[in-house]
Amino acid sequence: MKLEGKKVTVHDMTLRDGMHPKRHQMTLEQMKSIACGLDAAGIPLIEVTHGDGLGGSSVNYGFPAHSDEEYLGAVIPLMKQAKVSALLLPGIGTVEHLKMAKDLGVNTIRVATHCTEADVSEQHITQSRKLGLDTVGFLMMAHMASPEKLVSQALLMQGYGANCIYVTDSAGYMLPDDVKARLSAVRAALKPETELGFHGHHNLAMGVANSIAAIEAGATRIDAAAAGLGAGAGNTPMEVFIAVCARMGIETGVDVFKIQDVAEDLVVPIMDHVIRIDRDSLTLGYAGVYSSFLLFAKRASAKYGVPARDILVELGRRGMVGGQEDMIEDTAMTMARERGLTLTAA
């Protein structure tokens, strides 16, 4: 398909999904520096919150270095052309968080649910639209649902008021044909004015290819992160995606070289570990496991002596999804007992 001249809105994940590998410990100065770099490079939309969205600060998901209010309040006044978005997962974030985000100047709210649980998004999507916000329905772990099931869930979110629907490959499991099948079906079912988006992870090195497949299927919003900073092996690497789009004539409005500099000079130096496809993050993609489970599995591995890869494969076998982080340690402990390993950890 000829994509030359097609316009796409790129949505940066560095300061939200990138909080997962940073264990939510990004400083305000790091946030501001990277956000300003992204803004100057021409990125139109930048997501800023705890990795698990508004209200994510908790024992289950991790305590951040600063509150959502502090991060948003630091970044938004500095933006010259970029708008700022926030993620919200019903059950973690509340309507009060929505109002706080609106008051701070957030432009876009993305309401995220598991791909078969769109009905829990009604209150938050409805309220977001009442507040006049650009409102996105975000269907996570989309590889676990058939195209037909995704269509039914997308239509629910559209009916609640979402003006954009995302098909989200949270596990980095999908291949380009999987992406096309799902996004094509959803695109055909939505109103013409409802936008379609795609969020990928790079666990099988498919982030860029899947994003191009999504554009071919009708997506006009694509998520990516500078230097790929995100859960698992990271999100679609923004600087690579922008270069590929430039080669193909897809219009993003982002400067090819400035976004490279943001990735290399601002994002790579703050990484706690190199974001790459190691055996554990590769296993996320292969077994279809939620990407933010990676560090939880590594911690459980160190505690119980069961290889992280084995834990991740078992999580995939059990079909665990986002929100079940507390079950990762339980799974590792059970596996250790079954293997006769001595449980010395407190």
Swiss-Prot record:
Keyword Metal-binding carried by entry: yes
EC number: 4.1.3.39, 4.1.3.43
Outcome of mutating residue 290 to F: Loss of stereochemical control as the mutant is able to catalyze the aldol cleavage of substrates with both R and S configurations at C4 with similar kinetic parameters
Swiss-Prot/TrEMBL site (Transition state stabilizer) positions: 16
Residues annotated for substrate binding in this entry: 16-17, 170, 199, 290
Pathway in which the depicted protein is active: Xenobiotic degradation; polychlorinated biphenyl degradation
Keyword Phosphoprotein: no
Residues of the site described as Governs stereochemical control: 290
Keyword vocabulary terms for this entry: Allosteric enzyme, Aromatic hydrocarbons catabolism, Cadmium, Cobalt, Lyase, Manganese, Metal-binding
Pfam annotation, one family: DmpG_comm
Miscellaneous field: The aldol addition reaction proceeds via a compulsory order mechanism, with pyruvate binding first.
Name of the protein this chain belongs to: 4-hydroxy-2-oxovalerate aldolase 4
Organism: Paraburkholderia xenovorans (strain LB400)
Lineage: Bacteria, Pseudomonadati, Pseudomonadota, Betaproteobacteria, Burkholderiales
Gene name of this polypeptide: bphI
